[in-house]
């Protein structure tokens, strides 16, 4: 993903909320997606399931991004150690939290990630020197942080400017809820204002903006606005809508 983004190629993925069989990654790659994003905050995969998916993702050369239940050192360390290289960290409200996330995600000299022995997170590679291995792993990690509150947007530039933060996004429903516009006629307008602020700030700091979309038209709109990381819908939403559309025709 880092290489594709460096080449300015749009990366289109989807959320995995329901599937637990790692073979879902093979199917998504065969469908043409560029990556998958597995949710641990609002769904229930075990750390063993995440490890299995991470192993297959790397064998397939198909990036797997994981949202942990919390953006703390413990969860970031566990995910990296089982072989996850892409993090999508929720509830990053302050520059201090962003700094803690960035420090936990990479080894010295740019961070203070907890040192682990040989394992999936290091490709079991005992041949590289310690310095070369740490530099390689640091270069693979990609960190996206989620801004989901008014406080986060008050610190927008500081969070985005944090060294080690690669991309930013917003949590639309949590943000709308906090701003008091969830389910109101103004929700779309207010969220779009925040999306445009986020994109402008990301571009100003040389970082990426990521965006969740529900339709192809939404994706096209934000790509034209400069977004290069798109999360299109989810396994749950795509399955349900496809079955519902078919059943409506079969049982008119």
Annotate each PLM feature.
Residues 72, 113-129, 141, 147-154, ...:
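C-terminal alpha-helical cap/extension of soluble enzyme domains
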């Amino acid at each position: 993903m880092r290489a594709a983004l460096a080449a300015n190629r749009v990366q289109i993925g989807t959320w995995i909320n329901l599937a637990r069989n790692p073979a879902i990654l093979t199917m998504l790659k065969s469908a043409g997606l560029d990556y998958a994003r597995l949710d641990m905050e609002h769904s229930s995969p075990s750390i063993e399931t995440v490890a299995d998916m991470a192993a297959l993702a790397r064998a397939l050369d198909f990036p797997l991004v994981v949202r942990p239940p919390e953006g703390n050192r413990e969860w970031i360390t566990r995910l990296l150690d089982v072989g996850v290289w892409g993090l999508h960290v929720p509830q990053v409200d302050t520059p201090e939290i962003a700094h803690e996330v960035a420090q936990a995600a990479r080894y010295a000299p740019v961070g203070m990630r907890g040192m682990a022995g040989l394992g999936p997170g290091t490709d079991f590679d005992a041949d590289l020197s310690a310095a070369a291995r740490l530099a390689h792993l640091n270069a693979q990690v990609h960190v996206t942080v989620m801004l989901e509150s008014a406080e986060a947007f008050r610190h927008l530039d500081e969070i985005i400017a944090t060294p080690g933060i690669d991309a930013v996004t917003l949590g639309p429903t949590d943000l709308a809820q906090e701003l008091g516009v969830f389910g109101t006629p103004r929700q779309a307008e207010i969220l779009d204002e925040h999306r445009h602020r986020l994109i402008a700030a990301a571009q100003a700091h040389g970082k990426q903006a990521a965006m969740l979309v529900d339709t192809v038209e939404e994706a096209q709109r934000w790509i034209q606005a400069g977004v290069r990381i798109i999360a299109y819908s989810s396994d749950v939403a795509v399955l349900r809508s496809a079955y519902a559309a078919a059943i409506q025709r079969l049982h008119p």
